[in-house]
């Protein structure tokens, strides 16, 4: 989904059951400051996830004819994290549950190594490509650089990606 393949391409891919999301997410979404989230509007002037902010609000027809989210994930790690996470947090706060997925654009953006941005998916049984993709769609994954691991992460006994995996508090409080 890059750079301007838009909702029409998402419709075409989702009708086939694809897992889809924009690449190079942060380009064009630069914001001043270093707080997350912040209320500084990005310029939307690059090749990144500029269309994501609109596409995430749509549902499209899936392979079985039912409506599914037009965007499954937002790619992370290969552009400045503040720019990527800022737009993701804002869409999460608006109620859209888009997942994140690691991305490496080796050697175009970074020549450091293949696998700079990785998606780790918690699977119950044998690894297959389809199960791995479904794990991202369900949110049973985290993104990392290979140096830290959170595969058993949970809050208040709620595992990531199980059910709606949202933790709701009636008022500010501690989570464990």
Please identify what each model-predicted range represents.
Residues 2-114:
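Domain-core and long-helix interface of multi-subunit machines
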Residues 10, 15-19, 25-30, 87-176:
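C-terminal functional module detector
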């Amino acid at each position: 989904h890059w750079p301007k393949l838009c909702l029409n391409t998402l419709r075409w891919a989702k009708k086939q059951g694809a897992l889809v999301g924009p690449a190079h997410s942060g380009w064009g979404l630069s914001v001043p400051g270093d707080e997350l989230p912040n209320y500084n509007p990005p310029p939307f002037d690059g090749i990144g996830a500029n269309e994501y902010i609109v596409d995430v609000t749509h549902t499209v027809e899936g392979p079985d004819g039912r409506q599914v989210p037009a965007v499954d994930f937002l790619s992370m790690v290969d552009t400045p994290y503040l720019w990527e996470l800022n737009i993701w947090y804002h869409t999460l706060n608006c109620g859209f549950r888009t997942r994140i997925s690691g991305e490496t654009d080796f050697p175009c953006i970074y020549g450091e190594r293949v696998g700079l941005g990785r998606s780790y998916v918690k699977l119950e049984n044998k690894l297959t490509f389809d199960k791995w993709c479904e794990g991202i769609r369900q949110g049973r994954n985290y993104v990392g650089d290979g140096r830290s691991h959170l595969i058993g992460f949970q809050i208040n006994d709620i595992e990531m990606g199980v059910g709606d995996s949202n933790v709701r508090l009636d008022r500010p409080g501690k989570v464990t």
